[in-house]
């Protein structure tokens, strides 16, 4: 089992990027949730426009699927400038980054996704570009090689990462604006899925929106994916409208329960409860019991279960909490 196989994966699956682009908010006034981020960015953007300056460099971090790319697009739209998009793994050589930087117009936004995966050589090029709007490049090879400086137009670098701790200090310190995106509450996800349904021309009742939102693991990308799958169910098994009952039947059929857990989440929790008496159980034993690799458990399955308080990670191993027992209606033996 890999993350991309799961309906409730926060990673991008197949052609979702193009679909999400169609329903993505374009301006801060359309942006739902993250009130602290929205308020701060409104002020920073308005101040930069009043001064006629490029917006300061922005670092956006947080779990996948929370809208880092969406926020980068909104910032460029609000500033009225072009957005150039790339990612850390794509920028393999210093020349790749230099080509992008030299093609920027004044105040343009350069968005680098997965910025924590930049190679050290490419990262070194970024330092003077971010700080002084200058590009240091080498011309020629061997003894005849020489360094020249090119002036760059003022620009805004927006870096996005799910692993802010993996950034080097010199790179992290060059971002004047740092924004952390948090998991969304159900109420915000209800607004998001209602807006998405409207963009897609779907009839979605408040009860249907609530069922989708509460099972979305606090992640808009999952909300929108579930909406598309429930739409399919509603068109085939109902009259096309998505109400609470239709949404519940569709999501139950898709094996997404009221907590947003899928088959693999439940399999892991029940293994700890039934096979290991609630734990503690070592990671290798747990991996063998459910037929998964330990890396899959650590990186894919565990994080959300731990965050929601269903699993505890202790020095002796994994323990199922009272929440886990209650979820399955199992009485915990003392």
From Swiss-Prot:
Location of the region described as Head domain (RuvB-H) in the Swiss-Prot/TrEMBL record: 258-334
Catalyzed reactions per annotation: ATP + H2O = ADP + phosphate + H(+)
Region (Small ATPAse domain (RuvB-S)), start-end ranges: 185-255
CDD domains the UniProt entry points to: AAA (cd00009)
Compartment list: Cytoplasm
Family: Belongs to the RuvB family.
Protein's UniProt name: Holliday junction branch migration complex subunit RuvB
């Amino acid at each position: 089992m890999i993350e991309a196989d799961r309906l409730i994966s926060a990673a991008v699956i197949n052609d979702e990027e193009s679909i999400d682009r169609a329903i993505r908010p374009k301006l801060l006034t359309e942006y739902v949730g993250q009130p602290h981020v929205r308020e701060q960015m409104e002020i920073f953007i308005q101040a930069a426009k009043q001064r006629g300056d490029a917006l300061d460099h922005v670092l956006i971090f947080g779990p996948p699927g929370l809208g880092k790319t969406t926020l980068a697009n909104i910032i460029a739209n609000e500033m009225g400038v072009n957005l150039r998009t790339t990612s850390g793994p794509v920028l393999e050589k210093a020349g790749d980054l230099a080509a992008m930087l030299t093609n920027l117009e004044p105040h343009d936004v350069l968005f680098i996704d997965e910025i924590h995966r930049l190679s050290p050589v490419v990262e070194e090029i970024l330092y003077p570009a971010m700080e002084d709007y200058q590009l240091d490049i080498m011309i020629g090879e061997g003894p005849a090689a020489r360094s020249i400086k090119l002036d760059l137009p003022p620009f805004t670098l927006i870096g996005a990462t799910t692993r802010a701790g993996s950034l080097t200090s010199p790179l992290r310190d060059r971002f004047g604006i740092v924004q952390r995106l948090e998991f969304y509450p159900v109420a915000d996800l209800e607004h998001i899925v209602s807006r998405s349904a409207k963009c897609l021309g779907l009839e979605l009742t408040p009860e249907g929106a609530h069922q989708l939102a509460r099972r979305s693991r606090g992640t808009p990308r999952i909300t929108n994916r579930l909406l598309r799958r429930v739409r399919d169910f509603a068109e085939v098994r109902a009259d096309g409208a998505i109400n609470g009952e239709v949404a519940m039947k569709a999501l139950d059929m898709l094996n997404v329960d009221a907590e947003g857990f899928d088959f693999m989440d439940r399999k892991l929790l029940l293994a700890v409860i039934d096979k290991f008496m609630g734990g503690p159980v070592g990671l290798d034993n747990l991996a063998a019991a459910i037929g998964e690799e330990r890396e899959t458990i650590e990186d894919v399955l565990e994080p959300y279960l731990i965050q929601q308080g269903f699993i505890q990670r202790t020095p002796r191993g994994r323990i199922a909490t009272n929440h886990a027992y209650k979820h399955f209606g199992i009485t915990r033996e003392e």
